[in-house]
């Protein structure tokens, strides 16, 4: 997971006014899969649509003309060459000079990234990744977003994304992301860079071995079954349910047991630790979209009731994690340990137990950072995936019918197993397509730590870069019917879509060396939950429920929840066919025919 980014300024574009969300300043109507109100779109006269299309074509033509005329071309000064020659004459080695001046190239012209300028008010009424899509359609796969002295590079080109995330990943850090998350994740795997990241990745990745993932399938099934019990009660009473909060509690219960063997039991209880976790989660999300980092003001931490609550919540969580680490250490010391590649303690198969049993020599503070990182990353993203998957399913009954047919055939009335994961192909494609339309997160953040060339554009170190996964996943250049929810766009007998076989136009879990290490864990978690809920219930948008709208946070949330009605499925009875026999058939012949 990566968090959405803070905004200090934003570009000037035309947007319609919408109602502000209490969760965030960045909101967009999302009653359809493309984040717009379909009723509003359908009400626009064809003549107006044609006019808008003509205006858009005119803007793009003007941009092409400006590029052709050299408006985005910078003529390089001969000054760097003069300096380089002078330094050479006084004995500076040529390899040092080449390194110092390589990014500046020769005295030839070089292209300048197209630039969009503006003010913060222009897009405060929309989730930020929506205006980025509109700008992408105008400016192309890479452009600079400039406001005052600050600028960002927006990347929506798969080849450039691949270069940043994979081919030259060593030249990029997490940048702003690490600064935002330091208060809660410290030097955990997601915000960490350099040698700390390499060491922690080497320690944690082996914990996610095949035996562990297979054991987690049972955990996913048990937790999903507890959610089904709550839905059974709601269906019996005819009550509507708010699924986003339930999915959040489901994934919190799963990640607590999977990572550090702690039973939050949040589907049935509310405790101080659960409240503390949600306080910290909301703070992390709010910081990711706040235009002013007031939390960095020393006195603010003391006078702000909210910041005092965050500090208290963090202390409670850290104390709880310290207790869990101490308990697990005692358990490891007492067991007759024969550690091996797929080691797993049957009583406590958690990642924490694996790390301690492996002899991972780190401080309790580093362990806490790792556990907190996995808690946040593994909780919010999966909850968001399930929320938008079930929203999409309410819009396509034909997809639900195919989904139920597969689930009935593969798992029937039992819990799924690791062997079923390969058989639930259509269920997996539903999840794949949900992640395409609603990527979690919608933007990946990087900062250049070396000079580089993106496409044809030279960039300097220190550039903040936003890779728009939303744009990549909805680009009409790479997807047919890009806005349509169509799980069958990938053949069921083909490979599971990922960044490699989709040429980085599809980044559900990022890509390159910093790709999410829990991609298989998260995929199976989502598939199990979808299968178990769909086999038992039918879901529809609740009568009178507010339109589903998006808001920006660490992931894509709804503004007012996903309110659905739940009804228990009634499967057709499987009545065996009875052969028609003559009236004078004997009893023995009847028994033989029915046996």
Swiss-Prot record:
Binding site for heme: 516
Molecular function, one GO term: heme binding
UniProt keyword annotations, A-Z: Carotenoid biosynthesis, Chloroplast, Heme, Iron, Metal-binding, Monooxygenase, Oxidoreductase, Plastid, Transit peptide
Disruption phenotype: Accumulation of alpha-carotene and alpha-cryptoxanthin. Triple mutant cyp97a3, bch1 and bch2 has a highly retarded growth.
Matches recorded under SUPFAM superfamilies: Cytochrome P450 (SSF48264)
Similarity-based family: Belongs to the cytochrome P450 family.
Record protein name field: Protein LUTEIN DEFICIENT 5, chloroplastic
Gene: CYP97A3
């Amino acid at each position: 997971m990566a968090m959405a980014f803070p905004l200090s300024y934003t570009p000037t574009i035309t947007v319609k006014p919408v109602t502000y969300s209490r969760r965030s300043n960045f909101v967009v109507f999302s009653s359809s899969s493309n984040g717009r109100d379909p009723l509003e779109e359908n009400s626009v006269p064809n003549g107006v649509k044609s006019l808008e299309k003509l205006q858009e074509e005119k803007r793009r033509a003007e941009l092409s003309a400006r590029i052709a005329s050299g408006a985005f071309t910078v003529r390089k000064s001969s000054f760097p060459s003069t300096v380089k020659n002078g330094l050479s004459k006084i004995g500076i080695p040529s390899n040092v000079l080449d390194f110092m001046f390589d990014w500046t190239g020769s005295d030839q012209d070089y292209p300048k990234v197209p630039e969009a300028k503006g003010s913060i008010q222009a897009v405060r009424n929309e989730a930020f990744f929506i205006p980025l899509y509109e700008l992408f359609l105008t400016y192309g796969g890479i452009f600079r977003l400039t406001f005052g002295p600050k600028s960002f590079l927006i990347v929506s080109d798969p080849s450039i994304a691949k270069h940043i995330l994979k081919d030259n990943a060593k030249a990029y850090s997490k940048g702003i992301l690490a600064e935002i998350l330091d208060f809660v994740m410290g030097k955990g795997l997601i915000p960490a860079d350099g040698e700390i990241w390499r060491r922690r990745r080497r320690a944690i990745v082996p914990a996610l071995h095949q035996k562990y993932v297979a054991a987690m399938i049972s955990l996913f099934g048990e937790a999903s079954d507890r959610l089904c019990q709550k839905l059974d009660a709601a269906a019996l009473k005819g009550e509507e349910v708010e699924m986003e909060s339930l999915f959040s509690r489901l994934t919190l219960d799963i990640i607590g047991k999977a990572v550090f063997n702690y039973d939050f039991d949040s589907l049935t209880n509310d405790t101080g630790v659960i409240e503390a976790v949600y306080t910290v989660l909301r703070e992390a999300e709010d910081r990711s979209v706040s235009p002013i980092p007031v939390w960095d003001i020393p006195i603010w931490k003391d006078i702000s009731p909210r910041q005092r609550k965050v500090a208290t919540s963090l202390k409670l969580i850290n104390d709880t994690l310290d207790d869990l680490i101490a308990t697990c250490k005692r358990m490891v010391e007492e067991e007759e340990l024969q550690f091996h590649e797929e080691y797993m303690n049957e009583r406590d198969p958690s990642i924490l137990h694996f790390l301690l049993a492996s002899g991972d020599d780190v401080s309790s503070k580093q362990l806490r950072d790792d556990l907190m990182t996995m808690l946040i990353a593994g909780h919010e993203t999966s909850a968001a995936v399930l929320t938008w998957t079930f929203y999409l399913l309410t819009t396509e009954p034909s997809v639900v019918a195919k989904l139920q047919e597969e689930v009935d055939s593969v798992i029937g009335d039992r819990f799924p197993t690791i062997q079923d994961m390969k058989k639930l192909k259509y269920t997996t494609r539903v999840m794949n397509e949900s992640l395409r339309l609603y990527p979690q997160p919608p933007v990946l953040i990087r900062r250049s730590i070396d000079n580089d060339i993106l496409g044809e554009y030279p960039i300097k170190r220190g550039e903040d870069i936003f890779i728009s996964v939303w744009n990549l996943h909805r680009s009409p250049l790479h997807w047919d019917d890009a806005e349509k929810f169509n799980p069958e766009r990938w053949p069921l007998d083909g490979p599971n879509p990922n960044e490699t076989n989709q040429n980085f136009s599809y980044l559900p879990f990022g890509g390159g060396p910093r790709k999410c290490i829990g991609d298989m864990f998260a995929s199976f978690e989502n598939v199990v939950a979808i299968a178990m809920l769909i086999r038992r219930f039918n879901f529809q948008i609740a009568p009178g429920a507010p339109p589903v709208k998006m808001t920006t946070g660490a992931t894509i949330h709804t503004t007012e929840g996903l309110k659905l009605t739940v009804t228990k499925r009634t499967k057709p009875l499987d009545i065996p066919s009875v052969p028609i026999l003559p009236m004078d058939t004997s009893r023995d012949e009847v028994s033989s025919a029915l046996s």
